[in-house]
Amino acid sequence: MSATPPIPSPGSSKPSSPRSASRNLGLNTRQASRPQIGARRDTNNGSESPAATAPIPDEDHGAELPLTMTASVILTGLPKDAHRALADVEAIDAGKVTVRFHPLPSAPILRNRVFKISASQKFETVVRFLRKKLDCSESDSVFCYVNSVFAPGLDESVGGLWRCFKTDDQLIVSYSMTPAFG
């Protein structure tokens, strides 16, 4: 059985055992003999230079924040005012949009394929107009696709579809009597 060394009290400076005293002494002497990390020795006499232990000063880059957008190298112009941007959108929706109907296989062909519609109308209006031109009954289905890629929602704006998916300034609407795409 080994005896556990007594626990020193917080206020006592006397080491608990002679072995720990020699350890502390050895550690302190080793630390004193080693130069500090980052300290530079004077090349003339081998002693540490007091200037070498000073922290590295921060550099002032001279940048003044915030940088104005007119002085920015990246931006070539200022963004539009919100009211002006909204007015531009309303002006686009006030005009007319050209819609070209393209029949898919098994769909009847229209005599005239190009029509104009107000940009503020919903895509539902385009589908109703197409059903009327094809003389569809209430039970007949008409499937419409923009650019033969996707079927837009009936509540989509025709002007928005035209702005995003126009081809040669026309909105290409493919139609079929049966589902053509997945």
Swiss-Prot record:
GO terms for cellular component: Atg12-Atg5-Atg16 complex; autophagosome membrane; phagophore assembly site membrane. This is Ubiquitin-like protein ATG12. Residues 23-34 have a biased composition (Polar residues). It comes from Coccidioides immitis (strain RS) (Valley fever fungus). Keywords: Autophagy, Isopeptide bond, Membrane, Protein transport, Transport, Ubl conjugation pathway. Its main location: membrane. One of its GO terms (biological process) is piecemeal microautophagy of the nucleus. Gene3D superfamilies: Phosphatidylinositol 3-kinase Catalytic Subunit, Chain A, domain 1. There is a cross-link at G182 (Glycyl lysine isopeptide (Gly-Lys) (interchain with K-186 in ATG5)). Belongs to the ATG12 family. One of its GO terms (molecular function) is Atg8-family ligase activity. Residues 10-22 have a biased composition (Low complexity). Pfam families: APG12. Residues 1-63 are annotated as: Disordered. It is a peripheral membrane protein. It is found in: Preautophagosomal structure membrane. Forms a conjugate with ATG5. Ubiquitin-like protein involved in cytoplasm to vacuole transport (Cvt), autophagy vesicles formation, mitophagy, and nucleophagy. Conjugation with ATG5 through a ubiquitin-like conjugating system involving also ATG7 as an E1-like activating enzyme and ATG10 as an E2-like conjugating enzyme, is essential for its function. The ATG12-ATG5 conjugate functions as an E3-like enzyme which is required for lipidation of ATG8 and ATG8 association to the vesicle membranes.
